[in-house]
Amino acid sequence: MSGGRHSGAAVFLLPSSAMSEPKGPSSPGTDFIRQVVTADVASARHGGRVVTRFPPEPNGYLHVGHAMGICLNFGIAQEFGGRCHLRYDDTNPDTEKNEYVQSIQEDILWLGFDWGQHLYFASDYFERMYECAEVLVKKGLAYVDSQPNEAIREGRGTVTESGVASPFRDRSAEENLDLFGRRRAGEFEDGEHVLRGKIDMASPNMLMRDPVFYRIRHASHYRRGDDWCIYPLYDYAHCLEDAFEEVTHSICTLEFDNNRELYDWVLENVGFEEPRPHQYEWAGLDLENAVLSKRKIAPLVEAGVVSGWDPPRLATLTAYRRRGVPPEALRLLSELVGISKTGAQTEAAKLDYAIRQVLNQSAPRVMAVLDPIKVVITNYPSGKAEEFEAPYYPHDVPLEGSRTVPFSEEIWIERADFSEHPPKGFRRLVPGGEVRLRYAYVIRCDEVIKDDTGDILEVRCSYDSRTRGGSTSDGRKVGGTIQWVSVPHGVTAEVRLFDHLFLDEGPDGQDSGAIGDHINPDSLTIITSTKIEPSVLADQEDTRYQFERTGYFWRDPIDGPGDRLVFNRIVPLKDTWGKRGTSLPPTKVEIQTSLRVEAHSAPKREASQQTRIPPDEQAGERDAEAVARMERYTRELGVG
C-alpha cells in the first residue's frame, strides 16, 4: 500500500499493539460509551469480556465517518483488553461486491488496526438466521404477509395514527411455516410474500409495527451464489449476527436509535438470554463541505465529476490515502471530535489541523517554487555552483537529517514573493530592497526585465557574498526570507492543489440529483511548471514533505511514480483555526495517536556552516474567529 514506511524520510510507525490483539487494557477514555463498558467490566456482566465489532456493508468504499467508527470500536477493544470483529453485513445480493470487501480490509489495516482471526460474514449465518425465524413463526411472533409492498407501507399508519393489521396476520403457525419453506425453495416471485414480525401495530415506534424480516429476491449473491432466494433485512439480521459472535457492546450511530427496541425484541424472543448484546448509539461524524453518502457519491463518479472513488477531493479513505493524508491524522481527528450523544457538524479545518499536527513532526522540509519567476544574480561568478547544507527539520522537531541544496547565478523564486508596487507590510523582494534567500545569501533587486506586453521576464539582483548562510555581518535588518530553487539544478513537477469539492458546508443534506449543483469549480488547480530542489529525486516515492512556506505534499501514488513527478498537496501550511505555535501537549498527542518517529536517514555532510530553519517570517496574525475556535477546541479537549 502506498503511504507506508520508507527509509528516506521520517515517518510515524504504527504501534505494534494496533496490529495485533491487545494483551491487556490500557487507560480507557471517559466518554459515555466507555463509561458503560467500564461499568460492565467492573460488574463482570459478560464475564469481564469486551467484544465489539465493525460491521460495514460491502457495497462501497469507506469514508471518514467510518474511520471514526473503526477507531471507536477497535480502540475500545484495545483499551479494555478485548477484541474487535470485522464483520461484513452482506445480506443484500444486489449491491455487494468482493471489490469492496478487499478495499475495506485495506482501509482498516491502513488506519493501524487488525481484526486478527475475527473476520466474519453475515452471509455465513443465513442458515442460523432462517432457523431463528422458524422459532418466531412457531411462537406465533412472525407471519408470512402476502400483501403488495405498497399496501404494507400504507398499513403501517403514521406517527399520529396507528397502523392497520394485515389480513394475513392471523395465519396459523403451520401455514406460515409451509409458506416460509416454499419461499426458500423458490416457488414464489420477488415481492410476492414477506415475513413480518408480529409485534404491535399501534406502537409509537413505527419500526415495531410488524417490521419486515425477510424478502424474496432472486439474485445471485457474490459469496453464496444462488443458494438463497430469500434474504433477511438489517433489523432482523444485525442483532442476530451480534449474538452469534457473542458481541458484548454493539455500537451504532444515532440514526439507529429507534432500532434499539427492535434489536432487543428479536434477541429476547428468539431465546437469547442475558447477558446478551445491547446496542449503544453515538452521534457519528458529519464533516462539513463533504459528501459521505455512498448513494450520493455514486452519481458524481458516473457523471465523471470525479474519476472513481479515490480522487483526493473525496472524503473516502481510499481518496485520503491517495491524497497523502497520514492515518495517524484520522486517529487524532477521532480524538479531537470525541464521542457524544448529540450530533454536530465537524469543521473541515479540524481535519486539516490534525493532519498538520502529525506531518509537522515527521515531514522533511524542502524548497519548491509553485509559480516561478527567474532571478538572475548579476554579480555572482558566471558558471559557478556551490552547495548549502540545509536541515530537514526546524529546531522544534526532535529529528535529525540534512541535505545539500545547489545554488547558482540563476534561481527561481515565487512570483508572489516579488512586487513592484508592494502593499503595506510586504516584506519580500521589491525594487531596491533586500530579501534573504533561505540558507543562502541576501540579495537586492536592481532591475526588472519585461517583455513588450509588460509581463516580467526576469528580476536582476546582486548578492552580498558576506551573507553566506543568511546572516548579515553588519547587523542590518533584512525584510523577509523566501525559498528558491536553482535554475540549472531544479526539477520540474506537476502539482495538484485541492480545495473543498463542494461549496455548501452541508452537501450531504442535498438531494442526490442536486449534489452536482454545489460543486466547487475551483476545487482542483493543476500547476505544471513547479520547480523543486533536486534532493527529492533521491527519496522514496511515498515521502511526505513540507514544501517550505507552502504546504505539505507527496507524490501521487498513481500518476506520480517513475520519471514523472506529480505531487498532491495534502494540506496547506496555513492553519485556519489554530493559533500559530499552538498544539496539543506532547503527552496528549502521544496518548491520542500512539506515535513514535524515526529520523530521516539521508547522509549528513560536514559543512562549515549549518543552518536551522527559522520560523516562517511571512506568516501573519490569525483572524479572531480562528483564534476563538482554537480556544474552544482547547477547552473541549481539556488541555492548556
Which residues does each predicted region cover?
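Short, Lys/Arg-enriched N-terminal segments with co-localized hydrophobic residues
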Residues: G3-A18
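N-terminal catalytic cores of NTP/NDP-binding nucleotidyl/phosphoryl-transfer enzymes
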Residues: P28-Q105, H221-T253
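Secondary-structure transition/capping motifs at alpha-helix termini
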Residues: S43-H46, G75-R83, D107-G116, K139, ...
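Active-site cores that bind ATP or allylic diphosphates and position pyrophosphate for catalysis
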Residues: D90-N92, V135-K296, I355, P364, ...
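A glycine-rich helix N-cap at a beta->alpha junction
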Residues: Y100-F126, C132-V135, G140-Y143
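Long, charged, mostly alpha-helical binding arms that flank functional sites
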Residues: P275-A354, V358
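Substrate/cofactor-recognition hotspot
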Residues: L333-T634
